[in-house]
Amino acid sequence: MASYSTNDFKPGLKFIQDGEPCVIVENEFVKPGKGQAFTRTKIRKLISGKVLEINFKSGSTVEAADVVDYNYTYSYKDEDFWYFMHPETFEQISVDSKALGDNDKWLVDQAECIITLWNGSAIGVTPPNFVELEVIETDPGLKGDTAGTGGKPATLSTGAVVRVPLFVQIGEVIRVDTRSGEYVSRVK
């Protein structure tokens, strides 16, 4: 298996730490005035989602993780699994709720998602950055009701709840940023 030296560390590098695939979020080479140089890294474990800060001695090595990201198209959901299809090979893959996390609220038919595979099994799903969803429930916006200007909560067709401006009505389609869960615009 391939390995990486601390000299190869950069954000986005994936490796194995404590038997779990991790990705480097930040790294910094530190050369103290006294003592051995080291690399301070902030890593995120891909399965558990924990963020840790670990120091590696200068020149030490870590094992490379066999982690690959693929583009898949969301197909459908049954009771326990969500199914995605590869757009070129038409191969289907099933993903459980542990790998999907809370991203199920952003999945719409034919959505292009990025699935992270480790040793052939799905460990994470990244939905598209923006999705267009219909508002199925929200309070009516009253004319002149602008005190607070914080907007109002709206329930979308997938069950997600986002804050929207007062002018958004039931039945309208809105664009939502899935990374932050915030309203972006109305769709014409």
Swiss-Prot record:
The keyword Amino-acid biosynthesis does not apply. GO terms for cellular component: cytoplasm. SMART domains: EFP, Elong-fact-P_C. It is found in: Cytoplasm. The keyword Cytoplasm applies. InterPro entries: Elong-fact-P_C, NA-bd_OB-fold, Rib_uL2_dom2, Transl_elong_fac_P/YeiP, Transl_elong_KOW-like, Transl_elong_P/YeiP_cen, Transl_elong_P/YeiP_CS, Transl_elongation_fac_P. PROSITE patterns: EFP. GO terms for biological process: peptide biosynthetic process. Disulfide bonds: none annotated. Pfam families: EFP (PF01132), EFP_N (PF08207), Elong-fact-P_C (PF09285). GO terms for molecular function: translation elongation factor activity. May be beta-lysylated on the epsilon-amino group of Lys-34 by the combined action of EpmA and EpmB, and then hydroxylated on the C5 position of the same residue by EpmC (if this protein is present). Lysylation is critical for the stimulatory effect of EF-P on peptide-bond formation. The lysylation moiety may extend toward the peptidyltransferase center and stabilize the terminal 3-CCA end of the tRNA. Hydroxylation of the C5 position on Lys-34 may allow additional potential stabilizing hydrogen-bond interactions with the P-tRNA. The modification N6-(3,6-diaminohexanoyl)-5-hydroxylysine is found at residue 34. Involved in peptide bond synthesis. Alleviates ribosome stalling that occurs when 3 or more consecutive Pro residues or the sequence PPG is present in a protein, possibly by augmenting the peptidyl transferase activity of the ribosome. Modification of Lys-34 is required for alleviation. Belongs to the elongation factor P family. This is Elongation factor P. It comes from Glaesserella parasuis serovar 5 (strain SH0165) (Haemophilus parasuis).
